[in-house]
C-alpha cells in the first residue's frame, strides 16, 4: 500500500462533506499517494489542538453516514488508497460488522482505530478479514518488540508515532523518531510510515532518507482549513506539492 509515500490527512465533514471530497481529490492530484480520512469524535485523546478544533466544528452537523458518502465520492474519482482513521466509539455505536462492511463497500481500503490496542482487536480484525478490509496499527517509539512483531503481522503497514504526546506541527523531527524508525525497520517486514509532527518538506526528506516507507501529514493541512475554510483548495495543492518535493 505504501512505498516512499506521502499520506495526507483530512477531517471528514470539515468544513463540509463536499469540501472534504474536493480537498482529498486536490491532494491526490497534487502528489499525495494515500489519503487518510478522520472520523470526528468528541474525545480525541491522541490529537492535538489543531485537529481537536476541526473535530469540534465538524461535529456540529455530523452523522457517520457522511463519512461513507465522502469515501464513495472520492473513490468515484480516484484510485488512490484510502485509510479511515477513527476512534472505537463511533464504530461500536453503529455496530462493528455494519461499520466495516459499509466502509469497505464505500471504497475504504484500510482502517486505523486509534484507541484499539492490537491485543484487544481480535474480534475487529476478524470482521475486517471477512470483509476484505485491511488494518493499520499505531506503534509508539517504546512499543516492545513482541508487540511490534504482532502488529506487523496484522497491519497493511505500521504507523509509527514519531514522538510521545499528541498530533501537531513541530519545528523539527525529534532524534527519538529516527531511533524508533531504525528499530522498527529492523523488526517489521511490512512498510513503516511515520507520523505526528511531520509538517515540512525537509521533515519528509529526512524521514524517507532514514528509511521510512511513508510519512503522514495531518495537522499542517487541517491548520490551512482552520484558517481558510472553504477557500483552502489552492493552499492544499501548494502544500501537497511542496511536501512531495521531499520525496525526490
UniProtKB/Swiss-Prot annotation:
Pathway: Amino-acid biosynthesis; L-tryptophan biosynthesis; L-tryptophan from chorismate: step 5/5
The protein's Enzyme Commission number: 4.2.1.20
Matches recorded under InterPro entries: Aldolase_TIM, RibuloseP-bd_barrel, Trp_synthase_alpha_AS, Trp_synthase_suA
Keywords, alphabetical: Amino-acid biosynthesis, Aromatic amino acid biosynthesis, Lyase, Tryptophan biosynthesis
Pfam families xref list: Trp_syntA (PF00290)
Any Gene Ontology CC annotation: cytosol
Transmembrane segments: none
Enzyme class label: lyase
Keyword Lyase included in the entry's annotation: yes
Active site feature: 36 (proton acceptor), 47 (proton acceptor)
Reactions listed under catalytic activity: (1S,2R)-1-C-(indol-3-yl)glycerol 3-phosphate + L-serine = D-glyceraldehyde 3-phosphate + L-tryptophan + H2O
Molecular function GO labels: tryptophan synthase activity
CDD domains assigned: Tryptophan_synthase_alpha
Its job: The alpha subunit is responsible for the aldol cleavage of indoleglycerol phosphate to indole and glyceraldehyde 3-phosphate.
Similarity comment: family membership: Belongs to the TrpA family.
Subunit structure, interactors included: Tetramer of two alpha and two beta chains.
NCBIfam families: trpA (TIGR00262)
Name of this protein: Tryptophan synthase alpha chain
Recorded name of the encoding gene: trpA
